[in-house]
Amino acid sequence: MKVRASVKKLCRNCKIVKREGVVRVLCSDPKHKQRQG
């Protein structure tokens, strides 16, 4: 899980999800998981 100021899709499988006010990126590739912090 990477914590970043700006989250971006890294591939076409990445999805941007807003969960409880936190922007997250979910992907089939675990290396692409991100959270905005």
Curated annotation (Swiss-Prot):
Domain of life: Bacteria
Gene Ontology BP terms: translation
GO cellular component: cytoplasm; ribonucleoprotein complex; ribosome
Pfam families: Ribosomal_L36
InterPro entries: Ribosomal_bL36 (IPR000473), Ribosomal_bL36_sp (IPR035977)
GO molecular function, one term: structural constituent of ribosome
Assigned keywords, A-Z: Ribonucleoprotein, Ribosomal protein
Family: Belongs to the bacterial ribosomal protein bL36 family.
Name this polypeptide is given: Large ribosomal subunit protein bL36
Organism, scientific name: Pasteurella multocida (strain Pm70)
